């Protein structure tokens, strides 16, 4: 039976905004300068008078100014064209664009609902509660707000009025808001859909700030026969071409590097070479660095070798693990005729994967059987690959646009409670944004445009889970943490699918829903089973997931999770769903910083004190502000709190430092003004040696101290050693000024609380 359809749009009541009060007026603002420097003090970016809410950190300000402001074509007060200067412009152009497109195609019940939608989105962005993926910041609203067009770049879209595939006529009238793409590649060299065509399709994606993943398993292995005679040069030779092409492109022009995922099935003839590709290249890098080449990731050593511009993953079916458990062999098969080309002990394959991942963090593993068991649309084909960060897994030639909710904005630190209603409201609000973004988007190929329209996948997620748990005083690796995380994730995904079904009630389900209806409803019911931890209720699942354990989960969160999934299934059974997928949990790298998140995505904190190097140069020192709040909640006094934080972060000053301090520096010949410069630079330094240089102090200072320019101009010059300080003295001063980067061993910290501050790195 076909799904029901009604005639009505979405209604939005106010949650965070106020009637007759502009959302822009709900915040106080600062005008700040944004300067990004290399560790040696050299400026790589500078912009003055950047307007942001006072609550935004300098890091969020710098990300906005350097990465997300439109840098040209924006009308200025004097009538000229220039760049964006305030977050108000960015929030307006994005929220207004979503409102305009949604209103144009009947997404809202009334004009008032559309206005509330717009104002709540502006508030959400300015409050850092939820923001979209980077391509939205780069592209969305440039045409509506500023009239920016640009020549067509070979993109396509499906016109919702007549459902016909059309070629875009400009670069920005329909933006490219999608961050995640999965493209197919056929075993063909030069024709459409083949190997060389893939690099062109990838280039269109990279240019507008997005990333792409592809499964290359169709391409025949080395020495397989070619139709015209001779033998194939093999997959690896072509992967190196794609790697070079990606490395030559900065996605978004000046925003970030190309993002690329390469997937390969575990039975491909060249799988062992693929597994060890980066291992061998890292050996070459080590040799080049030993010979004196730059060891930075953008240095000449890494630029010389291959394999540095993609994440690599192997697709592993359950049948491999059966062979592994039985100490059997694993067969590698020809792409052309399926014959067995090689049989290798499964243990050897697994050991090589583990060794390679240990050596260079690649390849990742994607569990093909499980992924396809949770596939909502198997009638459309198998899931073969993922996007570069591996959160989006769906059909080839589809795209996904993301948004991430900042969980800390819904966490009440006074009683460790979570604002379920506010979180559900925000989920519904932004699921609507992501659906509208599909409506307005253009895509890099005909296939991607058509299938993205047909399936309408979205990627709502969250960030700052690790920080929220840390502030709560709950260890990340604990049953209680898993209960809370499972419930919050279930609420988000359930409400997102409920919203999708709500939109389907008046817009209709996605075009390919009916043929996948039973499969999708089976997957939805399996999600509901996980919310109830009903192990016997799963259908079509070989390896059952861990459900939400009631004994470890706060009751109010568990009730909200099960209700969300009851509603999602009930409405879906009646109306279908507007979107084939709704949620993913992305790493939220750059958008996490603009929301001032201490932790990204679902991950634990990477480190308590972090230094993020930006593409193109520059560093940020990031200190996890969850630590002092967590210590306070755990009952530590302010003095104990300060001592623990200073142990990890450092005092950011030479006042009182051992050996190298204001007094000893005066004795060495530094002036008070020069010492003040050093103390100022110490606030963002991650090693004191980096600030004792000509960029911080000036050539006149170094000359006065007795050093010739040819000496201090040498990059290997160490001023502290030249002044007579010993290595032990420098280390002691460095720990005091810049911190130890860990709380382990900190004064007053109790052993039973160490696990709360555990990190992905061994430095918590």
What are these regions (language model features)?
Residues 1-764:
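Extended catalytic cores of very large enzyme megasubunits
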């Amino acid at each position: 039976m076909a799904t029901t359809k009604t005639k009505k749009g979405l209604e939005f009541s106010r949650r965070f905004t106020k009637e007759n009060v502009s959302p822009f007026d709900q915040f106080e603002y600062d005008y700040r300068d944004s300067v990004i420097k290399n560790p040696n003090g050299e400026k790589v970016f500078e912009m003055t008078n950047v307007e942001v809410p006072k609550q935004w950190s300098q890091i969020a300000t710098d990300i906005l100014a350097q990465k997300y402001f439109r840098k040209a074509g924006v009308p200025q007060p004097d009538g000229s064209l220039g760049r964006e200067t305030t977050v108000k412009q960015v929030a307006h152009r994005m929220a207004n664009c979503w409102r305009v497109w949604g209103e144009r195609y009947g997404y809202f019940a009334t004009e008032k609902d559309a206005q509330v939608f717009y104002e709540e989105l502006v508030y959400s962005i300015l409050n850092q509660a939820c923001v979209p993926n980077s391509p939205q910041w780069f592209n969305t609203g440039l045409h509506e707000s500023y009239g920016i067009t640009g020549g067509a770049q070979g993109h396509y879209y499906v016109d919702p009025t007549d459902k016909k595939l059309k070629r875009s006529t400009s670069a920005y009238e329909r933006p490219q808001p999608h961050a995640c793409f999965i493209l197919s590649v056929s075993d063909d060299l030069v024709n459409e859909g083949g190997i060389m065509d893939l690099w062109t399709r990838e280039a269109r994606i990279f240019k507008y700030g997005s990333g792409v993943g592809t499964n290359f398993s169709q391409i025949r292995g080395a020495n397989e026969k070619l139709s015209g005679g001779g033998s194939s040069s093999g997959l690896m030779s072509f992967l190196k071409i794609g790697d070079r092409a990606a490395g030559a492109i900065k996605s978004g022009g000046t925003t970030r590097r190309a993002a690329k995922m390469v997937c390969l099935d575990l039975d491909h003839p060249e799988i062992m070479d693929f597994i060890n590709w980066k291992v061998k290249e890292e050996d070459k890098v080590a040799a080049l660095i030993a010979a004196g080449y730059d060891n930075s990731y953008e240095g000449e050593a890494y630029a010389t070798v291959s394999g540095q511009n993609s994440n690599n993953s192997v697709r592993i079916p359950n049948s491999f693990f059966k062979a592994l458990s039985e100490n059997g062999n694993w067969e590698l098969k020809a792409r052309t005729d399926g014959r067995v080309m090689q049989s290798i002990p499964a243990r050897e394959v697994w050991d090589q994967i583990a060794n390679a991942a240990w050596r260079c963090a690649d390849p990742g593993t994607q569990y093909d059987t499980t992924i396809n068991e949770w596939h909502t649309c198997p009638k459309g084909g198998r899931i073969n690959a993922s996007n570069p960060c591996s959160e989006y897994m769906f059909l080839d030639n589809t795209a996904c646009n993301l948004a991430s909710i900042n969980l800390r904005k819904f966490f009440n630190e006074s009683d460790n409670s979570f604002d379920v209603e506010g979180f559900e409201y925000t989920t519904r609000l932004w699921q609507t944004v992501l659906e509208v973004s599909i409506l307005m988007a253009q895509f890099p190929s005909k296939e991607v445009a058509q299938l993205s329209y047909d399936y309408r996948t979205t990627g709502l997620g969250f960030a700052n889970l690790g920080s929220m748990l840390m502030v709560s005083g709950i260890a990340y690796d604990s049953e209680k943490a898993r209960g809370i995380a499972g419930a919050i994730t279930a609420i988000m995904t359930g409400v997102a699918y409920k919203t999708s079904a709500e939109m389907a009630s008046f817009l209709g389900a996605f075009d390919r829903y009916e043929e996948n209806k039973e499969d999708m409803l089976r997957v939805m019911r399996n999600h509901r089973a996980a919310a109830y931890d009903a192990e016997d209720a799963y259908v079509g699942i070989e390896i059952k997931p861990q459900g939400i354990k009631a004994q470890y989960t706060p009751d109010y969160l568990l009730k909200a999770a099960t209700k969300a999934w009851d509603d999602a299934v009930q409405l879906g059974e009646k109306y279908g769903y507007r979107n084939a997928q709704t949620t993913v949990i992305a790493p939220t790298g750059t958008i996490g910083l603009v929301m001032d998140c201490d932790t990204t995505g679902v991950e634990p904190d990477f480190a308590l004190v972090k230094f993020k190097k930006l593409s193109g140069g520059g560093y940020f020192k990031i200190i996890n502000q969850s630590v002092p709040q967590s210590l306070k909640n755990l009952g530590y006094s302010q003095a104990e709190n300060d001592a623990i934080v200073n142990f990890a972060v450092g005092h950011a000053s030479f006042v009182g430092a051992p050996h190298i301090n204001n007094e000893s520096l005066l004795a060495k010949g530094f002036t008070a003004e020069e010492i003040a410069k050093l103390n100022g630079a110490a606030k963002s330094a991650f090693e004191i040696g980096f600030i004792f240089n000509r960029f911080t102090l000036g050539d006149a200072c170094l000359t006065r101290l007795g050093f010739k320019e040819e000496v201090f101009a040498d990059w290997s010059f160490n001023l502290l050693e030249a002044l007579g300080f010993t290595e032990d003295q420098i280390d002691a001063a460095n720990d005091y000024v810049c911190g130890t980067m860990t709380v382990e061993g900190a004064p007053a910290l109790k052993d039973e609380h160490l696990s709360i501050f555990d990190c992905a790195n061994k430095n918590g």
